[in-house]
Amino acid sequence: MKIITFSHYKEVTDDVLKDSYAVVIDLLRATSTMIWAISNGAKGIIPVEDISEARLLKRLDESVLLGGERGGLKIEGFDLDNSPLSYKKEAIFGKTVVMTTTNGTRALKKASCAKRIFLGSFINAKKTAEYIMKETLHYNIDTISIVCAGTEEKFTLEDILCAGYFVDLFIENFPDVFLDDLSLASHVLYKKFENDPHEILKYSYHYNHLKKLGFEADLEFCLRKDFVDCVCEFRNLVVEKV
C-alpha cells in the first residue's frame, strides 16, 4: 500500500488521485464539523466553494440550512457557522446543510477525481481508517491519498498532524506500506506529539487565529481522538454517512 500526502489542496494532482481512495482533512474545522453534523443526524452536507452558490441553493430549496465561515466567522445571513458545537442534534437532525468554508469545501471539490473520498479528523480517525483498510483490500486499491486542506493555500500544521495519525493507523494494519516523504514526516510529527497535540499546535498560525476569535472549545473538541463512530464519504456532491 502506498500512502501519499498533499500539504494543501492546491498541490493535489489528478494522476495520483484517480486511482486512489482519498482522505480529506480540514481538522480546524470543516471536516470535523461535517463529521459531527452527520453523526448528529444531518441528512447530508452539500459543500460549495462560493457564498453566492450557497445562497442560490437556499433560494431553490428553502428547507436547507446554510453553514460556513469566512475568516473563521459566521457568514452574514447564514443559519450556522463552522463550529462543530453549533451543529447540535436539535438544530440539524434530518436537515440538509449547504456549507462553504475558506479551505475545507474547496479541498473536497479538488479531490473529486479520486475513486472514493472520505472525510478525516481526529474525532473519527480510527473508525474511518478501519473502513478504508477493509475496502481497499476488498477492491484491490493500492494507493491512499491524504489531502490536507491547508489554510489559504498554504501548509498548516494541524492537518499534517492529523494526517500523521492516519498514517500511524495504516502502518499498524497494512503488512507492507510505502510512505512518501510528507507521509513519513507527518508520522514522525504525530508520534512526537500524540499525547498532547496542543503542545506543538499552540505555536501554529491557524490554531492561534481561532483562539483569538474565541473558539478555544472548538480546539479542544477537534483535537479529541476517536469519540465518533461515524464514517463520512463525499459522493455525488454530497457528504453522507457510509
From Swiss-Prot:
Catalytic activity: (2R)-O-phospho-3-sulfolactate + H2O = (2R)-3-sulfolactate + phosphate
Pfam families (alphabetical): 2-ph_phosp
GO molecular function: 2-phosphosulfolactate phosphatase activity; magnesium ion binding; sulfopyruvate decarboxylase activity
Enzyme class: hydrolase
Keyword RNA-binding appears in the UniProt entry: no
Gene: comB
InterPro entries the record matches: ComB-like, ComB-like_sf
Key words of the record: Hydrolase, Magnesium
Protein name listed in UniProt: Probable 2-phosphosulfolactate phosphatase
